[in-house]
């Protein structure tokens, strides 16, 4: 009399990746005053826009939706997002033997190992696809935050230019009048 034996094996595959995306760019500021003063004015303008000054006072930072934006006094803007992603998937394989278990155990285990290897390859593709999806999501978040924050940085540059022009005018002579209309500024100086 023969019996059928069923052997199952289950594995969980886990992969953890640290995904980063970012960029660095340089902003141009008119050199109305010496670079260190222009840098201080820029950082002060960014603080008014919600940035936080670092303890050394050489840069400002702001974090939005996991994106860290750093602007230094030299006008270098760095934006970076970093996230750790863990993907799990479980695979199961079953092998059977219709003969005496002792004699055909190796054949059943061979079937299981072959099935598991095939499923591992499929699972790795699924894991890589999920990680690629997450990488695309992170990039979209970075682009969205930068598009929004560009307006604040542009406004800070304009504010910096206006403050620098006022200081330069005061150095040249007596300021008679200052008229501001939005981003337009008219300064009258008596030399």
Where are these regions (language model features)?
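Interaction-mediating elements
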Residues: 1-191
């Amino acid at each position: 009399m023969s019996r059928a034996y069923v052997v199952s094996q289950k594995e969980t595959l886990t992969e953890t990746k640290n995904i980063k995306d970012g960029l660095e760019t340089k902003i141009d500021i008119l050199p109305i005053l010496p670079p260190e003063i222009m840098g201080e004015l820029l950082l002060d303008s960014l603080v008014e826009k919600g940035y936080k000054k670092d303890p050394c006072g050489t840069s400002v930072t702001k974090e939005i939706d996991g994106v860290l934006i750093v602007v230094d006094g030299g006008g270098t803007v760095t934006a970076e997002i970093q996230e750790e992603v863990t993907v799990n998937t479980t695979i199961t394989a079953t092998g059977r033997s219709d003969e005496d278990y002792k004699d055909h155990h190796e054949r059943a285990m061979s079937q299981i190992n072959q099935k598991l290897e095939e499923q591992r390859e499929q699972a790795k593709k699924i894991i890589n696809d999920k990680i690629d999806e997450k990488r695309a999501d992170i990039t979209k978040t970075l682009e969205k935050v930068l598009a929004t924050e560009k307006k604040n940085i542009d406004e800070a540059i304009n504010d910096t230019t206006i403050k620098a022009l006022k200081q330069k005018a005061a150095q040249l002579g007596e300021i008679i009048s200052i008229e501001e209309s939005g981003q337009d500024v008219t300064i009258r100086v008596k030399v």
